[in-house]
Amino acid sequence: MKTSEAHVMKRLLTYMWRYKWLTALALAFTFLTSLLLTAIPLAARWYIDHLVDSTETGSPVLTAFQFLILYYGLFIGRVLATYLSQLTFARVSNSIVRDIRLDIFKNLQRLGMSFYDQTAAGSIVSRVTNDTQAVADMFSTVFSSLVSSFLLFLVTLVTMFSLDWHLTIWILPFLPIIWFSIRLYRKLSNRLVKMTRQKLSDINVKLSESIEGMRIVQAFRQEKRLTDEFEQINAEHLDYANRSVDVNSLFLRPAMTLLQVLAYAVILTFFGLKWQSSGFTAGLIYAFIQYVSQLFQPLIDVTQNFATLQTSTISAGRVFEMMDRDDYEPKQAGSLKEIERGDIRFDHVSFSYDGKRDVLKDISFEVKNGQTIAFVGHTGSGKSSIINLFMRFYEFDRGQVLIDGQDIKDYSQEALRKSIGLVLQEPFLYHGTIASNIRMYHKELTDEEIRQAAAFVDVADFIESLPGGYDHPVTERGSTLSTGQRQLLAFARTIAAQPKILILDEATANIDQETEEMIQNSLKKMRQGRTTIAIAHRLSTIQDADCIYVLDKGKIIESGNHDQLIALGGTYKKMYDLQAGMMK
């Protein structure tokens, strides 16, 4: 994946090109700032030469008054131009970062589950927030400073040549030394900056992991272990940050200031040697000394901003790396726009997550509209993998999956998502209200349809007992509601969409027995007229399934209804007897 510094800068400039007129305005204000800043020493030179060295008669008070008006006029103009330049660059910066965040978020929505299964959530959050903010800092601070420094350096150098080119030539040997210093600094600091950003991402990962799993952390008394791990990562981040500071402290202002002092010494020596023969005026000497300072100041600013520039470039590279990820969810041909009935057939399907070891081996089954089938088996037998393939979270390796006799790949993504209702073991609720969580993206659903869906799964009474009813606020992940309540709301969300196919992935595994009994009738009503595939942990919940498939190590080893499997006396019966014994 191409993330070189030149490539990163080129891509960032393409974002800036979207706001080319606003950027051009910012550059114009920056150029005006440089001109006004360069004009101030010229005004001082005029004042000194006409007041101190001039033999012309005239009122000193009038000359001083004219100088003050000119000087403060230039100063106020420079301040105003600087303000407008920074303001415009900030607008461009904020717009660019908004676009980058939107683009990376859009790409995250397209990425398949394989990406999320392999990437820590904290790392993703770090790139979308911290790294994009570093890019914002680059445009609002670094880029504007670099442009301003370049223009000021160029205008100052031209002005110095126009004043006295002999003097200016004595300054030129310092430029290659400065260039070499900058190159050496970049070489030494690049790796340190990259590792500092990586350790910051690791901190976000560990923090996110700790917060999301706090119940488990406290239940298993893992606070000290996690604290030690966090302290180690934090110490590594501190080490790289301090090493970066060491390099910055050596190569930034101290080195540039030393070169500036040497330049002063050279110029003053030249003035001393040539004073009698050159005819230098006091105003020229003052202006030239000011321009030497003004010539070095942009170089000092550039070196000071290199640390931020490198951080921003590396951060932008990390952002573009994620933006360029193309391990999307499986592609759909999209020629079929609607599922008519919901008949499903798996025909000799095999699948591997890593491309080496099959987790599903030659899976074949069929379920008609209105029928219910269930998959049971020990952990790791492949039950959830079947759901992952059918939901098109992953692409199967061999075989074929058909819906209504058509290849599942021929349906549009919208048709599949609209016609399939998925209820997971861990129900997920979004920040919002009860009604918005039931409605989800189906904006066309009326409030009455929301209430009907809630009543259908017997959760309406609970909702209406809440303060605000359907407008009751839901916190992130619905943490203030019980697992059973969240699951009932997930059922209401599913039924509100009126899917033709129902997928229940251990949907009652985390519900207490009393709540389970309460929703069994609702589940039966939900399944009527719909093709239903259920993954079950509690065998008691799928005894009325038309067919039950027993999986072991990715293969179907038994199939039949409950009575047939009990009579068979195989794995299913052993599982059933074990659960029945635990219930006694």
Language model features with spans:
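Membrane-integrated ABC transporters
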Residues: 1-37, 52-67, 85-89, 93, ...
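Juxtamembrane helix-loop junctions of ABC transporter transmembrane domains
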Residues: 2-5, 28-29, 36-49, 74-121, ...
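An intracellular "coupling" helix at the cytosolic face of ABC transporter transmembrane type-1 domains
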Residues: 18-21, 113-114, 130-139, 143, ...
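Alpha-helical segments in transporter systems
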Residues: 21-42, 71, 88-90, 136-149, ...
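Transmembrane helices of ABC transporter permease
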Residues: 22-34, 74, 141-195, 269-280
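Transmembrane helix-loop-helix hairpins at lipid-water interfaces of multipass membrane proteins
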Residues: 23-81, 161-166, 278-282
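Helix-loop-helix
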Residues: 55, 159-173, 247-317, 322-323
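ABC-type nucleotide-binding domain
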Residues: 60, 265, 331, 337-584
